[in-house]
Amino acid sequence: MDDDEELERIRRQQLESMQRQAMQEQMREEQEKQREAERARRQQILRQILDPSARERLNNVRLVRPDLADNVENQLIQLASMGRINRMLSERDIIDILSKLTENKREPKIERRSK
């Protein structure tokens, strides 16, 4: 009888472990769906406020400075949700925004000394 109880205990533990794993996998899938939905929502908003050349410019910036592109996107989405953007933004507008955000950055100074 002792062996049967031990076997039953092991089976219960395995079942509980499998159930936990299934729940964790389900939670991961749900989180991924939420992230995808948020990405789709952001892209939809950006399509409404940026013309194709502006989107392309922002994507090019993302290749070099993903943090800067995210910052610009977040600001644009926030302004759009507040109703402060009432026209399509062009590539020139994006260039102006990028220059304003990066103008405060200090450029490294390289001095060359000759002997």
Swiss-Prot record:
| Membrane-spanning parts | none
Keywords of the record: DNA-binding
Task: State where composition is biased (Basic and acidic residues).
Answer: 26-41
Q: What InterPro entries does the entry give?
A: DNA_bind_arc, PDCD5-like, PDCD5-like_sf
Q: Which one of the record's GO molecular function terms can you name?
A: DNA binding
> SUPFAM superfamilies, from UniProt?
Double-stranded DNA-binding domain (SSF46950)
Q: Which stretches does UniProt call biased (Low complexity)?
A: 15-25
Q: Which GO terms describe its cellular component?
A: cytosol
Annotated region Disordered: where? 1-41
Which NCBIfam families does UniProt cross-reference here? PRK04239.1 (NF003268)
What's the protein called, per UniProt? Answer: DNA-binding protein Ta0052
